[in-house]
Amino acid sequence: MSDRYTYRVTWSAEDEEHVGLCLEFPSLSWLAPVPEEAFSGIREVVREALVDMLANNETPPQPLADRAYSGKFVVRIPPETHRDLVIRAAENGVSLNRLVSSLLAD
């Protein structure tokens, strides 16, 4: 199951090593001198955490990839930004929703 989670490897200037991260387990990380070792290290740490959670009857987090998404979310912005976006959408002959969707996709 640990292969279904969302992993990232990035450089840690503070540690001067690559750090492996798992988005669903934000408290876990693994440092290594090369990216491949950081990736395999964090996957092993997550695997061990899952084994431990299941042994203690804890529910592991649902992988981001397995979650259902509605395609809708609410964003609060300043009224001036809202106005500017409406004007920009009108100038482009598209709906506000289409404009914002396009901007977010970039």
Segments predicted by a language model, with ranges:
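Short, charged, surface-exposed hinge/linker loops at domain edges
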Residues: 1-6, 43-106
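A short, exposed loop/beta-hairpin motif centered on an aromatic-Gly-Thr core
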Residues: 25-37
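Short acidic, gly/pro-rich beta-turn/loop elements at beta-sheet edges
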Residues: 17-19, 30-32, 85
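N-terminal segment of the canonical double-stranded RNA-binding domain
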Residues: 1-21, 25
